[in-house]
C-alpha cells in the first residue's frame, strides 16, 4: 500500500470515529466500575512472569485510546503510573479528555497522533496497551513495529486483534452493506441506516441474523457499536498463521495469550488419549491452529509481547518459594469469602485451608510482610498448595531471591 493510500485509509478511519466516537460507554463522575486485570500492571506482570514487578512507578501508553474507556481504567488501576493516550480522531480524543477529567483520572496526557508516528513521543514505555487498533490500520505490521520501538526493556505490549473464524458472519454483512451503499460508501450514517434496514429485512432464520442476535445484538443496540462492527472502512481479521506473521514481524517475544483456558487442548479432545497424543506431536503454533479450527467461536486474540529481558519465576525451587512474600491478587470481586470471582470474573470456591492462608496473606501490593515459610509454619498447608494459588492467579508472589532472566 502506498503512502497516499495509507493516508486515505487513516483519514477514513478518523472520519468514522469523529462521526461515532468509540467506545460509547457513558461518562461518569467517579472511577469506572470493576477491573480488567490486563490493564493492572502488577496483575499483568505477574501473569507474564510469575512474580510481582519490582516497581509500580511506570510509564503506560494507550495506543489508539479512542474515547478513553481503557485509558481511565489504566489510570485508576495504576495509581503510581503516568499514562499517555494517543489517537487519530480529534473528536474521539475530546470525549477521552472529558471522560478522564470527570472520573478523576488526572495522571494522563492525550495527543492526536498516529501509531505510525509514535516515534515522536520522547518516552519509552513499560506497558503499551493497543486494543482493537492494529486490525484497523492500513499496514498493521508497520504499526506494530512502530510500537515495538517504544517498548522499554522488560516491558509488556498488550494487543487485541480480530479473529477471522469467529467473525465470519460479520465479514459477510460488512461486504453486503458496502455493496448496497455503492457510491455512498464512506457516509457512515448512511451505512448504519442501510445495515439496520438490511437486518430488519432478512428472515429470522437467516444465519447472519441468528448469529447477530445470539452474540452481538445487545452490544450493537448503539449506533457507535454497529458502525464500528459493520461499516468500518478498514479491517484485517487474523488466523493463527497470519497472527504469528504479525507477531514475528514485531521483533518482540511472544509471552502468551491472556485467555489460556481457551488454548487448553484438553478441554476439546481430552476424552481421547489417542487424539491427545497425536495433537501433542504438533508444534505449539500448530496446536493453537488446531484449537481454533475445532472451536471457531473465538472472535479476537488477546496476548502479551515483551522486549527482553523479562525475568521468569516458576517457583519450582522450594527455597525460592519459602522466602517469597505472597499478597492477595488485586483483581478479585467478593473477597473476603470462600466463594468469589477471580481476576477473570470466574467463580472460585476455596477450601477451608486455602481460605485461611489467603486471609493471612498481605493486602494487594504490600511487599513488606510475612513470607510463605512464616505463613505455613505450624500448618498443614503445603508448598504445592501455595503453587496452586499462584497458578490460579489468586496470589502474587514477590521474590526475595533474584529471579532468572
Regions found by a protein language model. Name each.
Residues 89:
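Conserved SAM/SAH-binding beta-strand->alpha-helix loop
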Residues 19, 29-58, 73:
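Conserved alpha-helix/loop element of class I SAM-dependent methyltransferases that forms part
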Residues 104-116:
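Conserved SAM-binding strand-loop segment of SAM-dependent methyltransferases
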Residues 156-208:
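Conserved class I S-adenosyl-L-methionine
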Residues 268-294, 300, 347-405:
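Long, charge-rich, low-complexity alpha-helical segments
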Residues 67-79:
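Conserved SAM-binding loop of SAM-dependent methyltransferases across substrates and taxa
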Residues 119-127:
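A short acidic, Gly/Pro-enriched loop at the edge of an enzyme's catalytic core
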Residues 141-153:
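A short glycine-rich, Lys/Arg-flanked "PGG" loop and its adjoining helix->strand segment in the class I
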